[in-house]
């Protein structure tokens, strides 16, 4: 009897063990690793500029809206909203259960200041954050996203006080925003860091250090800024007190510094990292079967002219230089539109300056006459990866134009190249224009007069009007017309397309990016 009992007991143990071993492994509460090539300079969402700065912001903050996998804005801090019949007034009813996460570092900072703050996220926090982004002293890189707000442009120029902004707090949980013009892209703007909430009391307590370290930032999203190891990594951890619709499944995400994107590619391949974006040589990296790749044609390698330079601001000169280049013959993956193909715009009716040597020569002669010169030295600056491209362009100019033109190619380290671009110390540059918005009108707005990203210093009232009209009422025909305007005026010469490769380890799921790498979301990540 005892032997039978022991035998039965062993069978039961084996069955239980079998079921236990067959139990599905828990894929939640895991830690994820992402490779970066540049450490964030700060964590202030209103002035977030780099890919990683924006990525950390969209994961640690809840804006009024959040982008889903289809790039569509979904209600986030907003419980309900309505838009007036004329499309100019937005009224948002906010959730009443949102709170800022107060980390141990922030607690220590507040204790040092002998004060406390209201953890509730209310309408005035969103109003303060948005108005901050309009102020000239904030110098928000993405101010343009909010420029349709009533009086935004005058406030940004310092012509009006911020109290005149079309942003009104009705009560703690009702916010009203009035626009000066209709903006089809406005809900998208409210998914971006530039519009995120900012607690005024905490902001003022930091005395100019807001967002510079983990103790100087509070956020209301599914993650919070946990630690910063200078020149090594940044870690965001799950906000266990979060009550919104986008609760974090993973325990946290680490952003780890690498020398090149090739290093990131190798680490995603060997499983050190879960996900990464690759550029340049990393795209050619042979990745193993454990990695799923997606390629985005989101970079337009272009020849750009500096309109602040007295020579290249001459319209005839630019037309001459552009008209003697046959991009279809000289470059692989030639691009005949200002927009990269990422946007899926029908550009079949786009108008460009055709390759025409006689036309190029006549315009150059006209330019020489207008500039009152007989010879011309013109410099193209570029980084080493585009040296051959620059030499091809110079050879075309010197061979085809037939006037006294001397093209000079100056190859620079990336840091020196960027310094010259920012300081307007260039005539012509080979520059990668990269998608940083899901909307063609935002991409095209980088050519508008007051846009922070207008490295060409191009100023055209007519083009500004065209982009505003496009934002008011979007349409393929208008997108094409805007591009044609830039191309026919030789503001930019698109040369060829480049791709960004998004790779994720096949064991990871739930990570998604809504259009561009800065809008990558980790809250649903599992492995």
Question: Where are the regions that the model predicts?
Answer:
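Long beta-strand-rich cores associated with HINT superfamily self-processing modules
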Residues: 502-527
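Ligand-site clamp/hinge motif
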Residues: 241-285
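Ligand/substrate-recognition segments at binding pockets and active sites
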Residues: 366-434, 500
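Aromatic- and charge-enriched surface segment that lines or borders ligand/interaction sites
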Residues: 80-145, 176, 311-313
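Extracytoplasmic/peripheral linker and loop segments enriched in polar/acidic and small residues
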Residues: 404-417, 442-506, 527
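N-terminal lobe/hinge region of extracytoplasmic solute-binding protein
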Residues: 35-85, 218
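Gly/Pro-rich hinge or "lid" segments in bacterial periplasmic/extracellular proteins
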Residues: 158-165, 172-173, 178-252, 262
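Periplasmic-binding protein-like
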Residues: 308-357, 361, 389, 483-492
